[in-house]
Amino acid sequence: MIDKVFVCSDHWWVNANEKILSHLEKKYPQIVAYSFWPKDENEKVDYPDMAKVVCKNILEFQDSIWILICWTGQWINMSANKVEWIRSWVVNDSYSAQMIKEHNNANVICFWAREWLFKSYKKLIDIFLSTEFEWGRHLQRVEKVTHQYMNNI
């Protein structure tokens, strides 16, 4: 069961962290939520650095997920997936939010930084958090991808 959620955005949407944390605290009081940089929009953060730091923490907190936000969502996703054991996706719809967890056991969910999409992000986060990994044949696939990564294939 997920017991910690970490939220991190780059400088494009600084207040996203607080909005998402507020939603998590109201809806999931059993989950401890943390926020990482930046403190204001003047503090520039490069997404590769951000992804490296936050994704390394997943190894320390096994039952956790990360919510990452950057201008496109794609660059932070790509950077996150360079870190071993990370399974990250950009999510734009309900089906993807469910399937990345159910079939791929995703531990990072990424969004693009747009204020007007915040309501849909709350819904997608809720779907993601309420979905369980199905194991079975899906575990074999996740292990194959991990093996390919570890062997640089």
For every predicted segment, state its role.
Residues M50-V90:
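Helix-adjacent hinge/juxtasegments
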Residues F6-N15, S94-I153:
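C-terminal binding/interaction regions
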Residues I2, Q62-S64, N105:
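Short, high-confidence coil segments that cap the C-terminus of an alpha-helix
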